[in-house]
Amino acid sequence: MEAKERKETVRFDAIRLSLASPEIIRSWSHGEVKKPETLNYRTLKPEKDGLFDARIFGPIKDYECLCGKYKKRKYEGTICDRCGVEVTRSDVRRERFGHIELASPVVHIWYLKSTPSKIGSLLDLTSRDIERVVYFESYLVIEHPTEEEEEAFEKDPKSLPLMEGGLTKYVKLHVVSEDEFREREYEYSNAEKYEYGMGAEKVKDVLARIDLEILAKRLKKDLHGYAGTFDDLNLSYKMNYPRLYNKAIIEIARKFSEVGLRFGDIEPTEKEIDVIISQGYYIVIDPASSDLKFGQIINPENVDSLPEGVIALTGVEALEKLYKAYREKVKEIPIFEVIKESVRNVILKEGTDARLKKIIRRLRLVEGFIESENKPEWMILEVLPVIPPDLRPLIALDGGRFASSDLNDLYRRVINRNNRLKRLIDLDAPEIIIRNEKRMLQEAVDALIDNGRRGRMVTQNNRPLKSLSDSLRGKEGRFRQNLLGKRVDYSGRSVIVVGPELQMHECGLPKQMALELFKPFIYRRLEEKGYATSIKSAKKLVEEKVPEVYECLEEVVKQHPVLLNRAPTLHRMSVQAFEPKLVEGKAIKLHPLVCPPFNADFDGDQMAVHVPLSVEAQLESYILMLSTQNILSPAHGKPVTMPSQDIILGVHYMTQELPNAKGEGKIFGSPEEAVTAYELGTIDLLAKIKVRINGKIVETTAGRIIFNQILPEGYKFVNEVLDKKKISKLISDIYEKYGNEIAAQTLDKIKEIGFRFATKAAVSISVADLVVPKKKAKILEKAIKEAETVWKQYVDGIITKGERHNKIIDIWSQATNEVAKEMFNEIEKSERVENGKKYPGYFNPVYMMASSGARGSRDQIRQLAGMRGLMAKHSGEFIETPIMSNFREGLSVVEYFISTYGARKGLADTALKTAVAGYLTRRLADVAQDVIITGEDCGTLKGITVSSIIESGEIVVPFKDRIIGRYTAEDVYDPYTGELLISANEEITEEVVDKFEKAGIEKVKIRSVLTCEMPHGVCAKCYGRDLAQRKLVDIGEAVGIIAAQSIGEPGTQLTMRTFHIGGAATAKEVQTQHKATHDGTVKLQNVKFVVDKKGRKLIINREGSIKILDKEGKTIERFPAPYGAVLYVEDGQEVKEGTILAEWEPFSDPIIAEKGGEVELRDVILDVTLKEERDNITGKTIYTITFLRPKDAQLHTPRLVIKGEDGNEYVYDLPVNTILLIPKENLEEVWDKCFACSEAEKTDIHHKYLQVKKGFKVSEGDVVAKIPKEKAKVRDIVGGLPRVEELLEAREPKNKAIITEIDGIVKIYEDAKEITLINPKEGKTETYKVPDTTFVIVKNGSFVKAGQSLVDDGSIVAEFDGMVRLKSEGSRIVVFNKETGQQKDYKVPKGKFIIVKDNSVVKAGDPLTDGTPNPHDILRVMGIEELAAFLVKEAQIVYRLQGVEINDKHFEVIIRQILRKVKIVDPGDSRFLLNEIVDKLDLEEEINKVISEGGRPPKAEPVLVGITKAALTTRSWISAASFQETTRVLADAAVEGKVDPLKGLKENVIIGGIIPAGTGIKEYSEVEVVLKEEEKEEV
């Protein structure tokens, strides 16, 4: 049978949205609606000229006019002469528009009240002003220029070009209130000068007259100034942009004088620079042998008479040459780039973001209108379309009442007001009444289009009416409710029960459901077999449920797959295809192995069934969606269709060995012989026996032999105890070697054997199985003692509250772990006797369940038989008192109360966080939905470099896991032999990875979607292997959606899992030391240390690292050397595995004395920069640095100074929260005058300073102060999801680190605007202002001698001896690079901790202060690859903590999407604007276009946008509108006349097309499926 021809829908490739002109609206309409009436209450027929008029909208019954004169189809197309209704289908009432002719124009509210207002932007008025005009509160006055003013108007950026009689004139718009209007007497003044009006009418008039072309030119010119660079400076630039020009030349003059360059004898000022650039004056670059001086300025008239050989130039080029010649003369590297950059920055700074954004916004809008050929006046409505009546139905309820759509109400108000306004105008009513009516009409139309945007119309019972916009937006709107999520016919749902007898590709379908779902197929089969003659009789048979029906049902269902789906559908494995087997009863039977992918259990879950109808759909279900095709997860490539619980327990039990069991030590000639012996009862299932297998004698058990019999033929003999992980590996391996069919069969066999032996093992749980460890009491006693010691330290004031908390948490975490360890040890050692057999401890049922991975975790058993341990508060902090009992002993009342905390948090979290995770998934899917594999190979040479991930010295993700299945980006050679291991663009397979490991290769450059160069979508080689199929990804695979699901699904899952543990928190054990994990030689790289009194080596810098080298000198391990750590090894020392290299105190950062000497505190003032806290519990005093008022932070800089024995001062900044560790008896409080405060307040102010008593010294290596770290908190994904969101939304972190943009050497200065020098004895004070370019080289509170330089360039010198006071705002870190001469200056606010030292060497991208790195900074400084690596690493940390595996490539896909945009830094000759953010694709197209026309291409830099913004700024307006902010997206798209190229998935779903992925891509669209009858059985 040939496939039936289907009626093809019109294929189209793109959809354009634009504004409708009044003519277009009238052309849609079938008639004008003049009356607000709907139906006649007696006849219930529509009223003539009303909102449901059949003459306008079409007949109510099919092929029947209203009066009933014409009935039947033969009259189709006739218009009834009596009632005027066309005889046609009643469906036309769903598609025919009407219209209302408005008596006065009305503004479309979308264009008035959007932010920013479109009309406002166009007229350069604020949205508030436009509103006042539209709602008749103010006048719009147009000021025309007089002849004298014309030129001034033209230059004024505030004027607007309007067309009048073919000419364009510049006018000014004023919005004037009524009172002002009367005062100014505009009415009576010059009619040619002023024109005025109110309401939408006047606005329309102005909009219609705007000359868009000229406005665009003018805006471009304004923008052009801000794109100016050094090379653009000339006379015309000066004329056009005087302000920018002046700023630039002042900057050049400043830079020239900084380097000491002179024009002859003259100091360079802006005057000299100006004459050279704009007035044609020359400068001498090379005086040759003449008397002229280098740099001398020459009048243009005298140039011709210059002596021979003299080189003189003019313009900006002259300045550049002069500068370079000068720098070469003084033997310095010429870096004119620095000047160019600073000129560029000065000009850019003038174009503040707001100013530039506004111009760009206006220009975009104007160009949008020009390109789309929309007219601005179409934003004002003259004609209002009336949507078809069946889309706003009026339904008769019983009892003679009607339910009506809100739209009818809204339309009625519009018509009423419109008719009243017409009447008033005809009656020539007073202006004020007409004005009021016009305003009311405007409000009525506003409410119809978007109710609630301005004012809110409500029903009688105060419910806001649902307007047209409301029916589009939000979850219940048209897009999300009806277009993206349709309900499907041929589906049903029911409860699921387990079906262990099924095969893996089958499900049990209740006969009742099947009968309903397959009805049409059954009818057909009944007719074919001659049981029924017509559909009608077939229907009857089915209703009567005769036996023949069931016979046909069996045949129809055979080989017809159905789809099963379990909500929530979080990833593609939540919908799978099965072959139905008919079952009695009403429940769907589900195969137990497919529960994990569905996340289903049998405690009342329901599932939905869908029937694929067409042959193509059935084929796709079979080939792609059958459950046997979904064994591996697309998120990480490991099996997800997996045995669990009982099955695992059974397999675990049958592969155990039982010592001294019956028949131990017997020898068998073949596996079959051994199995027979077991079946005859001669040997025990678990007895150790010897068997000849493949010619070798193997020691094994009968159980293992039975297990091996179900494995595929030729698979190696598995001779070990199996648990969940090993079974997963086994399945993975079988899949790899034998393909998915064999894997599926093996899974089925494992299921059967697992259930069988779980039954035989009869493992059950009993209270006696929970062994409470004997050593528990001792461990607890020890922990209690330790905790008491910590309390004592706290009471004695040695440690702070925070440190006490952290230490106690650490003690109890360790104690809990020890108890658990002991418990498991005891369980393993304890023997039990059953039926005369001795079973070792590992046969303890509870232990077996946990160790096999069948159910429960070590944590849960710990709570049952060990101790419950620490509990978390709802805030995530730990409660210091742990629960020492376990569930077997029972909890005390207090313990029970403490544990309710966590349990309740779990339940509350589950409810709240599910929504958060769901929303994250939705944003991810939206941003990545159009990433599809569109080609085999894009041919790029780029890639990213990957290596293993190491966290605190441990390999968390091995190298091979990161590269397997990816493609190389370049050839890889063996570093020792030089042989080629793999060429570029080849797949990295398991064999290749082994080669890499042998050759010791630790990093390799691989292809990645981040660097893929496909214009749309990505190519297969950049993506690599499809994780679920273990082969190169297919063209057409929707990898974007898969990425979104893989990242979103665990988020949703994990937030639902919190409450299972019941709040029992596990603190991450704190790392306090580095241990060598290999033997080798120690290499200390850049580690500086001091030796303290006890002879310990303390590390005193942060950039060092400790390496372990092997015999060849290759680095095998690398540990960061933390500041303040005690170093236990020497450089070059040989160490064994397990040697402690360094150890540190984890709960605070110390400040260590680098040298011994006297101590002095500066600016440490009680109640100003220091708070004295007395602990109520301990009675001890703790001094903590803090700023009590923000103002204090500017005036004071707390510091600790050690006057070293070597005569140098060692200064340490004390950041906020620092705790002083100088013993209280060595401190004293001294009242003294504070010069900084006195200066600021202009009156004498005294403070209480904390000072160190004379004679108190510290030794080298003493800890003088410490900065405590945060309290330990529970890290679960609920804390982690917001972090993932922060990363993917590209938000700036709250406490962001400052990072350096260049390599270089660090210098740290005070960031002070003024220096005050004070000599109290002589009563002298002197204040110096510090320019931005100079750096203060003296510290606050230091003493200086007369004549000493206070700043780096020597421009400020102390006039007398005295003390320095700085009005400081923090520090300035300057990074200087000697090679390039580049210098960057960073301001660090007070209280932020600087982690670099003076003169330390930094690399671009290194952090200078503490805090979280800001991704935008990383992108700017280090580029896309580093940023991507950072985002992937940070996001993976969150998931890894939860034990969730997600392949890196999924994050890469999302990151590719949020890096799609670039910011234009130089528009060149392109259509782009300065600072505009555009799509990379658009940029590339434009660059090619500009180059082909011989222009200057634009330059751009990458920007990072968050996932929400990326989804909203996608090229498809349909997709963006269905995501968020629907009305705004649609309004913008309409004005610009945007075209949607329909390249993504969502937009095609919305228009009802086939999605361009999988079999829907263009390549497959021509394929036709032909079925031949006899082949059908084998489909």
Swiss-Prot record:
SMART domains: RPOLA_N (SM00663). Zn(2+) 2 binds at C938, C1012, C1019, C1022. It catalyses: RNA(n) + a ribonucleoside 5'-triphosphate = RNA(n+1) + diphosphate. InterPro entries: DNA-dir_RpoC2_beta_pp, DNA-dir_RpoC_beta_prime, DNA-dir_RpoC_beta_prime_bact, RNA_pol_asu, RNA_pol_N, RNA_pol_Rpb1_1, RNA_pol_Rpb1_3, RNA_pol_Rpb1_3_sf. Keywords: DNA-directed RNA polymerase, Magnesium, Metal-binding, Nucleotidyltransferase, Transcription, Transferase, Zinc. GO terms for biological process: DNA-templated transcription. Zn(2+) 1 binds at C65, C67, C80, C83. Binds 1 Mg(2+) ion per subunit. Binds 2 Zn(2+) ions per subunit. Pfam families: RNA_pol_Rpb1_1, RNA_pol_Rpb1_2, RNA_pol_Rpb1_3, RNA_pol_Rpb1_4, RNA_pol_Rpb1_5. GO terms for cellular component: DNA-directed RNA polymerase complex. The keyword Translocase does not apply. It is an enzyme of class 2 (transferase). The keyword Transferase applies. GO terms for molecular function: DNA binding; DNA-directed RNA polymerase activity; magnesium ion binding; zinc ion binding. Its EC number is 2.7.7.6. DNA-dependent RNA polymerase catalyzes the transcription of DNA into RNA using the four ribonucleoside triphosphates as substrates. Belongs to the RNA polymerase beta' chain family. The RNAP catalytic core consists of 2 alpha, 1 beta, 1 beta' and 1 omega subunit. When a sigma factor is associated with the core the holoenzyme is formed, which can initiate transcription. This is DNA-directed RNA polymerase subunit beta'. It comes from Sulfurihydrogenibium sp. (strain YO3AOP1). The gene is rpoC.
